[in-house]
């Protein structure tokens, strides 16, 4: 069972779905580059890194966007995340919360990518940007 098909199996629980996968970690804050914003993004990063370590998830990259609104795709970190997955260098995007990746309806380009939110661990977004229980 390859990793892409493993992702599609709904009978697996969250731990089984992400265990032994390669993930890109993505963090975002939309405020200006202040000490508060930098602390917030550092908190997201540490939260994701700690989770990955505890669950044997290999980190393929960590991408950050500071000062970018969540309703735009024009973010350098986000574009790097998409490129990393398209090149096959990671299996999943790991975020602290779905709204760190995008606010509102997921654009088509994001709808095609596997995303796991730690805050919503029992849910995942699939094609079409719809969430469902796993």
Question: For each predicted feature, which ranges?
Answer:
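Short, structured surface patches at the beginning of a domain
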Residues: 1-134
């Amino acid at each position: 069972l390859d990793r892409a098909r493993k992702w599609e199996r709904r009978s697996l629980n969250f731990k089984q779905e992400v265990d032994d996968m390669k993930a890109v970690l993505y963090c975002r804050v939309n405020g200006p580059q202040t000490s508060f914003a930098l602390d917030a993004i550092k908190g997201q990063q540490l939260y994701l890194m700690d989770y990955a370590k505890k669950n044997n998830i290999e980190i393929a990259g960590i991408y950050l966007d500071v000062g970018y609104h969540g309703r735009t795709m024009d973010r350098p970190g986000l574009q790097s995340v998409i490129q990393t997955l398209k090149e096959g260098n990671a299996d999943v995007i790991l975020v602290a919360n779905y709204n760190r990746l995008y606010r509102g309806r997921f654009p088509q380009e994001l709808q095609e990518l596997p995303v796991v939110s730690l805050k919503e661990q029992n849910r995942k977004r699939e094609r079409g940007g719809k969430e469902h229980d796993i």
